[in-house]
A protein has these predicted regions:
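Short, polar/charged alpha-helical segment
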Residues: 1-6, 119-121
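Short helix-initiation/N-cap motifs at beta->coil->alpha
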Residues: 6-22, 132-143
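Pocket-flanking alpha-helical
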Residues: 14-50, 144-148, 164-169
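Ligand-binding pocket segment of bilobal, Venus flytrap-like solute-binding proteins
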Residues: 28-32, 105-189
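Ligand-binding "clamshell"
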Residues: 41-55, 152, 166-204
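A conserved helix-loop-strand patch within extracytoplasmic ligand-binding domains
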Residues: 51-106
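A bilobed periplasmic-binding-protein/Venus flytrap-type ligand-binding module shared by bacterial periplasmic
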Residues: 64-74, 212-228, 251-252
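C-terminal functional modules
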Residues: 223-224, 233-291
Length: 291
């Protein structure tokens, strides 16, 4: 935007709640990663109020689930959560703190996904063979996966995309029962009860895969309604980046650029041509000249 359209740009990073609040208050012009499915009512309320304009999909596929390292998955034919249910397979992922059981590294206990995974373990019958292990932090979860790959050891873990780690390791997502809203709603009631009252209140329920989410883009109405900004809004609407490419860029950002956003952007623009279809040719020429 700066080099191609001649605008001064200030990039701001932040967590979901304050960043979205700033957009609604017209303090931020554009957000390029909105986890819309986690914020449906909030987004729709603000669209109705006229405070924001939605600009389409940034990353088309954001998934969560249970993953196994590809070498182990290929060797033992592990494609579905049901394939994990045997003592032979569980031994591959032995939990040193729970003799006789395998370990699935899960979410952090403070995150809702930890309890979701706990319920799924029981519904799927995985709890007979595996612990739902709390890694303690997001960094420890990443380290458990990366460490397994480094040592050539089997990995069985909860994880999600897009992330930098997914750009560096080869994990296979295990199939689960297909996402069903009614099933998810039923399971959520059990999850919320456990969060409030502890695991002893578990009741039989159904379970299914996490919904596959698209990450979207949005602009403040103040910015989008200014006619002078139309070329930028048109560009933001046009661009969409495949999840695999986002993973690669995040891996570059974390490991090769030293956390430098501009270097990461230049690497993406230099090594991909997909972006040229998002902008007029004169803008593309200016961007190329700046690399």
């Amino acid at each position: 935007i700066e080099k191609g359209y001649g605008c001064k740009v200030e990039a701001t990073k932040g967590s979901t709640t304050p960043i979205m609040a700033a957009l609604f208050d017209q303090q931020i012009d554009i957000i390029t990663e909105v986890w819309r499915d986690n914020l449906v009512q909030l987004i729709e309320d603000n669209v109705a109020k006229g405070t924001i304009v939605e600009l389409g999909v940034n990353t088309p596929s954001s998934t969560q689930g249970f993953y196994v390292d590809k070498p182990t998955a290929d060797k033992y034919g592990l494609k579905h959560v049901d394939d994990m249910k045997s003592e032979k397979i569980a031994k591959l992922f032995a939990d040193p703190e729970a003799p006789g059981k395998g370990r699935m590294t899960s979410c952090i206990s403070g995150w809702t996904c930890y309890t979701i995974n706990l319920v799924k373990h029981k519904v799927y019958g995985l709890d007979k063979y595996y612990t739902n292990f709390d890694p303690g932090s997001g960094g420890a979860l990443d380290a458990a996966i990366a460490g397994g790959f480094k040592k050539g050891k089997p990995v069985f873990s909860y994880y999600w995309t897009p992330t930098g780690l997914m750009g560096k390791v080869d994990l296979v997502k295990l199939e689960e029962p297909k996402y069903d809203q009614a099933c998810w709603d039923e399971m959520t009631k059990v999850v919320e009860d456990i969060k409030a009252n502890g695991p002893d209140v578990y009741k039989d329920t159904c379970a299914c895969e996490y919904v596959n989410m698209s990450l979207t883009k949005a602009a403040s109405t103040k910015f989008a309604s200014n006619a002078a900004n139309k070329p930028i809004i048109d560009f933001i609407k046009k661009y969409s980046i495949p999840t695999a490419d986002v993973n690669k860029s995040l891996a570059f950002y974390m490991d090769e650029s030293g956390g430098d956003m501009e270097a990461t952007a230049k690497n993406f623009l230099s090594s991909n041509s997909m972006w040229e279809s998002w902008v007029p040719s004169d803008v593309a020429s200016k961007v190329k000249a700046s690399l």
